[in-house]
Swiss-Prot record:
A GO CC term attached to the entry: apical plasma membrane
Xref: Pfam families: AA_permease_2
Transmembrane segments: 20-40, 52-72, 87-107, 146-166, 174-194, 215-235, 250-270, 291-311, 349-369, 405-425, 430-450
Position of sequence motif PDZ-binding motif: 521-523
Function: Amino acid transporter that mediates the uptake of the L-enantiomers of various amino acids, including L-glutamate. May play a role in promoting fertility.
UniProt keyword Iron-sulfur, yes or no: no
Organism lineage string: Eukaryota, Metazoa, Ecdysozoa, Nematoda, Chromadorea
Molecular function per GO: L-amino acid transmembrane transporter activity; PDZ domain binding
Entry-linked PANTHER family: AMINO ACID TRANSPORTER, AMINO ACID TRANSPORTER PROTEIN 6
Localization (cell): Apical cell membrane
Protein name: Amino acid transporter protein 6
């Protein structure tokens, strides 16, 4: 039977000399956030708000919301020392039905849709950069196949954890990210200062659309580009003097990112009119074609490289999330399998890729971003309610925590809730996908996981146990992996309790018999 288990709370206790200082924490935040979003969402934002001025205001507002969220999640992460983010905190609160429902959204929408958006954008930049022109149907399938080919290639690379290659490529992707953003900013401001291209900035708020629905959709798109602001939440104990370093690094890091994003969008707006941006499928390419002449090919090449890096990062995070969910007993333990020779969650990788390929057919990148944003911010509203519950009721938390003025989590909770409610009222079709999966997750939990429903049946427990063990053995043979599971007692570590070792689900040793077959022995 699939049970609800606790999550791992292990964090390395590094020496002071190995810990991250202020500069390291700032670079960690900036490096994790600045990426593909700035080349994906500008068109969506200006399409929703219809003006340069309001689109820039959206970028600034998204930076402030992300900064506020980052502070709140730092308090949460230092109060409850669990890996696994929102899902782990909801489990800690014993809100298992809610945690399970949002886990379903995370596995089927959040990560897969993000991967699909990045793959589709990669294909768009490659096709536009290469000047390939096909009829509409052929172009649709050609772009899909190119995106799928890339993520399948990256999947096999992650199967064998080619760390040396991945690390080197990550450096290349980081350089491409820096070069592309600097090139766009410098070029745009060159045309403003020396060529006097000011026409698009003269009436920045002309024609602005202030309707709540489009405004929230634009804000969702902006926040998608700032995604990753909770990164320090996963490594509070890795930071030197966290009570000083973490707040300063958030303020400085998020301010730097906000300045970079606004500068890039000002550069776009100097060169391209709102009409041109709305009509663009690859805004950086149209920018380059209008300003760089024969050197315009450099931009799509750099964007394609950084998108590959972003795809690999998303795939890495998503597969570990799926594997962690399996370790906790929410989904079959076969998915928790880790390759013993390279620590790769191969089954989780494959499952994630298959879901991402299916999700990519749900709509264009803008539609997928709305699905992701609604699901994410719904979950964050529940997570903030958990933090407020802990604060107001005075429940046990880790003694060495960072505690904010309570007005900050209250304000962030209101922001999350407001965006979700407005999205439901004004764009119910986009919200319906997330709401449907959320409701489906609750129904599945009540029927198949809740111990007063089917799991109370001895026959059901035996059947699910047999299916779980047989599927685990099958996946071990196919992928050469060993499944894992964590124990409930590890929850004690979350608030500074005693440590306990991870338990493992039944594992099997696979050995050849010499006649072309294999023997499976329970360990």
């Amino acid at each position: 039977m699939l049970n609800v288990f606790g999550v791992s709370a292990s964090m390395p206790d590094d020496s002071r000399s190995q810990k991250m200082g202020l500069l390291g924490a700032i670079s960690y935040i900036v490096g994790n956030i600045v990426g593909s979003g700035i080349f994906i969402t500008p068109t969506s934002i200006i399409e929703n708000v219809n003006s340069v001025g309001l689109s820039l205001a959206i970028w600034i507002l998204a930076a402030f919301i992300s900064m506020l969220g980052s502070f709140c999640y730092v308090e949460l992460g230092t109060s409850i020392r669990l890996s696994g983010g929102d899902f782990a905190y909801l489990c800690f609160m014993k809100w298992y039905p809610v945690a399970f429902a949002f886990m379903c959204i995370g596995c089927t929408i959040n990560y897969p849709a993000t991967l699909a958006v990045q793959a589709q954008t990669f294909a768009e930049y490659v096709f536009r950069g290469a000047g390939v022109e096909l009829d509409e149907t052929s172009e649709f399938w050609a772009k899909k196949l190119l995106g799928f080919s890339l993520i399948i290639l990256l999947m096999f690379m992650n199967f064998f954890s080619l760390k040396t290659f991945v690390q080197r490529f990550s450096i290349l992707a980081s350089l491409a990210k820096i070069a592309a953003t600097l090139l766009i900013i410098i070029t745009g401001f060159y045309y403003l200062i020396f060529k006097h291209w000011k026409q698009n900035l003269e009436e920045p708020f002309k024609g602005s659309n202030w309707n709540p629905g489009p405004f929230v959709n634009a804000l969702f798109a902006g926040l998608f580009s700032y995604d990753g602001w909770d990164i320090l939440n996963f490594g509070a104990e890795e930071i030197e003097n966290p009570k000083r370093t973490m707040p300063l690094s958030i303020i400085i890091g998020m301010t730097c990112i906000g300045v970079i994003y606004v500068a890039v969008n000002v550069a776009y707006s100097i060169v391209l009119s709102p009409t041109e941006m709305i009509a663009s499928n690859a805004v950086a390419i149209d920018f380059a074609n209008k300003t760089l002449g024969a050197a315009a090919f450099v931009v799509p090449v750099m964007v394609a490289i950084l998108l590959i890096g972003s795809l690999n990062s998303t795939m890495f995070s998503a597969s570990r999330y799926l594997q962690a969910v399996s370790r906790q007993g929410h989904i079959p333990s076969a998915i928790s399998g880790i390759a013993p020779n390279c620590d790769s969650p191969r089954v989780a990788l494959l499952v994630h890729i298959l879901i991402a390929i299916a999700v990519s057919f749900l709509g264009d990148p803008d539609k997928l971003i709305n699905y992701v944003a609604f699901a994410q911010w719904s979950q964050r509203a529940f997570t903030m309610s958990a933090l407020l519950y802990l604060r107001i009721r005075g429940r046990p938390r880790h003694p060495d925590r960072i505690q904010l003025p309570i007005i900050m989590p209250i304000l962030f909770f209101l922001v999350c809730t407001s965006m979700v409610v407005i999205s439901i009222i004004d764009d119910f079709k986009s919200s319906a996908v997330g709401l449907g999966i959320l409701l489906g997750g609750l129904i599945i939990f009540i029927i198949f996981v809740w111990d007063r429903a089917l799991p109370s049946s001895h026959t059901f427990r035996n059947a699910t146990h047999v299916i779980n063990e047989e599927s685990t053995k099958f996946m071990q043979i196919i992928f050469n992996v060993v499944p894992e599971r964590v124990g409930d007692e590890e929850m004690k570590n979350a608030i500074g309790g005693a440590e306990s070792e991870s338990e493992k689900v039944p594992a099997y040793k696979i050995s050849p018999t010499g006649n072309g077959q294999f023997k499976c022995t329970r360990m």
